Swiss-Prot record:
Organism of derivation: Staphylococcus aureus (strain N315)
Protein name from the UniProt record: Sensor protein kinase HptS
Gene this protein is translated from: hptS
Gene Ontology molecular function: ATP binding; phosphorelay sensor kinase activity
Top EC group: transferase
Membrane topology summary: Multi-pass membrane protein
GO cellular component, one term: plasma membrane
The reaction(s) this protein catalyses: ATP + protein L-histidine = ADP + protein N-phospho-L-histidine
Record has Membrane as a keyword: yes
Name of one Pfam family that matches: HATPase_c
Domain Histidine kinase stretches: 297-513
Taxonomy of the source species: Bacteria, Bacillati, Bacillota, Bacilli, Bacillales
């Protein structure tokens, strides 16, 4: 049966296209939109936080620089070898540190002196060297280093937004980090996936502040949600298809039955009338199918009978045209022999009568190949009387081939054509070779006559396709058309010839119309 899409299949597709798929699409669009908005908001937040942190650090740096500038002269009057001056220096530096919002530590180092507020002996290598300054105390130069451990704003950003801060130098060496996943002193290598970050320049030393956020957890949550949605979608699709199939089966059972009957009617296997299970309007279609099938069957039988009659008429007409053509040539021979050899003329008349009895037999259009060969031998014998035994006939055939059944008068035109167009002043040798192969009889008729030029050969080949009742050339054209009527396109007739080298005709006759070699 030809493949088609039943109504229930279309119902499944409609259910998916109109309900399940749009809902799933809306959810996907919503989820993608949510993540797009989330990424956009996070980018804006990171941008805002990096600007705020930069501003805060710049403000602290400016206050420290202002303090150093204002107290530079007073520091020069102090002598750090004096205990009271050391205490005054510590007091001023602590005042500077405590005025800043960041957690800062200082180290003042010089000749035989080291002052710091790092009383807990924290490792300053884990802190950011915020700034360095040279201070002069009583003609002695000291180095002031200020370290940043943290700032309230960075801590707030880390706590509230889970955004972490890094400070790196121009070579991407990490100088500060409030995330344990990074080690100070190592190279900063930005992650390509699962991280969002933004950086800004901090100072003239090309230090950069980086605020970043790890969104792996959010992505994993989104993937988990997508998996859950996919599972739910699959379950919905399965449930929807099963429901639609059950509903469609109940509602379209009669439709499928009618489609099946149409298929059977197309292949002429409908059978007797069978009503539908459900009494509905579809019963009218069912009745119409059977009525149309019966009408078509009657019409087909009528056409087949007409075609058979037409083939019989055409075959008889072709055979009728063969007889005058042959009789004319033979009667000329008899007329010639009556004067020279009445006894031989009597023999020719007897042979001619046997041939006419064979050709006018109307009870069947088929004969054994052996009968056709006997007819050809009598035909050549008559022609030899006319042409002084110039024709030599050789038949090569197996016994099995001789007992095959073929159409009557299917070989004689080949011999007639060889004698008529191949004979010259010298003798003419004609060889008939008969072979069986793959349900076909292969006939090869070869002569050593004058042959044909290439233009004449092309003309003869083209004339084979002319209408049998229109052409004036009877022989091969009649034979070819008769074969087409009796055997259809399975029969083949090929002509090969060269000038002064003879002619070869290859003729294939199907022995079984049901299994032929095309």
């Amino acid at each position: 049966m030809t493949a088609y899409k039943p109504y229930r299949h279309q119902l499944r597709r409609s259910l998916f296209a109109s309900t399940i798929f749009p809902v799933f699409l809306v959810i996907i669009i919503g989820l993608v939109s949510f993540y797009a908005i989330y990424i956009w908001i996070e980018h804006r937040t990171i941008h805002q936080h990096v600007d705020e942190s930069q501003s805060s650090l710049h403000h602290t740096e400016k206050q420290i620089q202002t303090f150093i500038t204002q107290h530079n002269n007073s520091f020069q009057e102090l002598d750090l070898t004096n205990h009271h001056d050391v205490t005054a220096t510590k007091r001023e530096l602590l005042k500077l540190i405590h005025q800043q919002p960041a957690t800062l530590y200082y180290e003042l180092s010089g000749p035989n002196q080291f002052i710091t507020n790092n009383y807990e002996h924290l490792n300053t290598k884990n802190m950011y060297l915020f700034s360095t300054h040279q201070l002069k105390f009583n003609n002695s130069t000291y180095m002031l280093k200020i370290y940043m451990a943290n700032t309230p704003r960075l801590s707030e950003i880390k706590k509230d937004s889970r955004q972490f801060a890094l400070i790196v130098d121009q070579y991407d060496n990490i100088l500060y980090a409030n995330d344990d996943r990074f080690t100070i002193g190592e190279k900063y290598r930005p992650q390509q996936f699962g991280f969002m970050n933004e950086s800004v320049k901090l100072n003239h030393a090309d230090h950069r502040l980086i605020i970043y956020k790890d969104i792996h957890e959010n992505i994993e949550d989104g993937i988990t949600l997508l998996i859950v949605m996919a599972v739910v979608l699959v379950l919905l699709v399965i449930f929807g298809f099963i429901s639609a199939d059950n509903m469609a089966k109940r509602q379209t059972k009669d439709i499928e039955t009618i489609i099946q009957k149409i298929y059977y009617a197309k292949n002429r296997h409908l059978g007797t009338y069978t009503p539908l299970k459900n009494n509905s309007e579809l019963e009218e279609i069912n009745n119409y199918i059977y009525d149309l099938f019966e009408s078509n069957e009657q019409l087909i039988h009528s056409i087949e009978h007409t075609e058979r009659r037409l083939r019989d008429i055409q075959l008889k007409e072709i055979e009728r045209q063969f007889q005058p053509h042959f009789l004319f040539n033979t009667m000329q021979t008899i007329q010639y022999l009556i004067t020279l050899s009445p006894k031989l003329a009597q023999t020719v008349v007897q042979q001619l009568s046997q041939m006419l009895r064979y050709s006018l037999r109307t009870n069947s259009h088929t004969v054994e190949l052996n009968e056709e060969l006997n007819y050809i031998e009598q035909y050549v014998a008559i022609q030899n009387i006319r042409f002084d035994d110039m024709i030599k006939l050789h038949i090569e055939s197996s016994e099995e081939a001789r007992h095959q059944t073929i159409g009557k008068m299917m070989l004689q035109p080949l011999i007639e054509n060889a004698i008529k167009h191949g004979r010259d002043t010298e003798s003419l040798d004609i060889t008939i070779r008969l072979t069986l192969a793959r349900q076909n009889l292969h006939v090869l008729v070869c002569d050593n006559g004058i042959g044909m030029s290439s233009s004449r050969l092309q003309y003869v080949r083209q004339s084979l396709n002319n209408d049998v009742f229109d052409t004036k050339h009877l022989g091969l054209n009649h034979l070819h058309n008769k074969a087409m009527i009796q055997y259809g396109s399975h029969a083949r007739l090929h002509i090969f010839s060269k000038r002064n080298q003879g002619t070869l005709i290859c003729y294939k006759i199907p022995l079984s119309r049901g299994n032929v070699d095309v």
